[in-house]
Amino acid sequence: MKQEKAIVVFSGGQDSTTCLFWAKERFAEIEAVTFNYGQRHRLEIECAEQIAEELGIKHHILDMTLLNQLAPNALTRQDIKVEDGQNGELPSTFVPGRNLLFLSFAGVLASQIGAKHIVTGVCETDFSGYPDCRDVFIKSLNVTLNLSMDNSFVIDTPLMWLNKAQTWELADQFGALEFVRERTLTCYNGVIADGCGECPACKLRKKGLDEYLSYRKEF
């Protein structure tokens, strides 16, 4: 029987929407939190709002625009080109401190609404080199949050060891593959659904979908 409550860190993208469906299957009550950190595309927040409303999930939007002032990057500035990391450098889309701050504020919100679980869609398999998507970081932060608030939060990372094809498969298991494909925004250029097809996020998303659909046809 479902008994516990969870808060889902929710961007309106493929991964966090899949996590939303994952959480709906596991917890008696869930709420979602989206962070406005000055993203290039306001549409990202609107997507999150629409999905949460359609699924009947209480949705919080927190102002984190200070992050844009501290750490300019390709996700928040039109004049910074979206580029993969070269020669060991981080991609231009990396936002220093983003997951640290988002999960910390999600922890504060969780303590206020009585949620034990904090769900996030970070993934080490297809993590694009972001250090704050690693399992070791999440485990460390989980300990820190509990010590800082004298609580017993559990940070759940259902996608941590899944590649993009497996993430599509997980959405399909919940009967949500088409929902995730048509309603979510992953594209760095702000194009909903299958996206622009050119940016790194769209290429990774399409590659995973093609792999999964090819695999599914065989069975």
Swiss-Prot record:
Give the first-level EC class, as a single word: ligase
Under the heading CDD domains, the entry gives: QueC-like
Reactions the enzyme catalyzes: 7-carboxy-7-deazaguanine + NH4(+) + ATP = 7-cyano-7-deazaguanine + ADP + phosphate + H2O + H(+)
User: What EC numbers are recorded for this enzyme?
Assistant: 6.3.4.20
Note whether Ribosomal protein occurs among the keywords: no
Cofactor binding note: Binds 1 zinc ion per subunit.
Pathway, according to UniProt? Answer: Purine metabolism; 7-cyano-7-deazaguanine biosynthesis
- Write down the InterPro entries for this protein, in alphabetical order: QueC (IPR018317), Rossmann-like_a/b/a_fold (IPR014729)
The protein's matches in Pfam families, at most eight in alphabetical order, are given as: QueC
Q: Where does Zn(2+) bind?
A: 187, 196, 199, 202
Report which superkingdom the organism of origin falls in: Bacteria
Q: Where does ATP bind?
A: 10-20
Annotated keywords = ATP-binding, Ligase, Metal-binding, Nucleotide-binding, Queuosine biosynthesis, Zinc
The coenzyme or cofactor needed here is: Zn(2+)
The GO biological-process annotations, alphabetized, read as:
queuosine biosynthetic process
Q: Name one GO molecular function term.
A: ligase activity, forming carbon-nitrogen bonds
Q: How does it assemble?
A: Homodimer.
Q: Which family does it belong to?
A: Belongs to the QueC family.
Q: What does this protein do?
A: Catalyzes the ATP-dependent conversion of 7-carboxy-7-deazaguanine (CDG) to 7-cyano-7-deazaguanine (preQ(0)).
Protein name, per record: 7-cyano-7-deazaguanine synthase
Q: Which organism is it from?
A: Lysinibacillus sphaericus (strain C3-41)
